[in-house]
């Protein structure tokens, strides 16, 4: 399985006197639609089970990231990504002799958590209004006012 996802802030265009042109300014804690596409070699039963629109899907992905150290060797860090959301699309792929099917499942991501070596670096929950980067609440000042 291979996964591809992207986090993109909503932006608003700022222009006016004293600004040389326009600036696309991110709106803190607001995100565009986030999708994750899971690529499968074949049509697994759990890929079709994910298409139940009445269930929220949560997937935990783990990896070991290899880094170069200053002595010419390697160090390793653990990576954990948790995705939560609803199914958007299922592409069963193609049937071709002696080839993979290339099936995909696309999710609308509403929950995104990334940890590196057990430390949370990104934590987004669209429905709960959570947005943390390196442990700092990006919405704290806004939430205190509303």
Language-model-detected regions and their locations in the chain:
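N-terminal interaction modules that seed assembly of large macromolecular complexes
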Residues: 7-32
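Short, acidic/charged, Gly/Pro-enriched secondary-structure junctions
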Residues: 50-84
């Amino acid at each position: 399985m291979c996964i591809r996802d992207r986090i993109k802030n909503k932006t608003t265009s700022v222009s006016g006197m004293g600004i040389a042109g326009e600036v696309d300014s991110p709106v803190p804690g607001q995100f565009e639609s986030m999708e994750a596409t899971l690529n499968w070699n074949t049509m697994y039963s759990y890929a079709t089970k994910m298409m139940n629109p009445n269930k929220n899907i949560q997937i935990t992905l783990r990896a070991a990231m290899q880094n170069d150290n200053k002595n010419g060797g390697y160090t390793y860090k653990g990576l954990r990504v948790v995705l939560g959301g609803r199914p958007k699309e299922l592409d069963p792929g193609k049937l071709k002799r002696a080839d993979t099917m290339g099936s995909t499942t696309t999710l609308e991501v509403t929950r995104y958590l990334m940890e590196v070596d057990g430390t949370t670096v990104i934590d987004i929950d669209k429905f709960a209004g959570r947005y943390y980067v390196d442990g700092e609440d990006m919405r704290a000042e806004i939430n205190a006012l509303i």
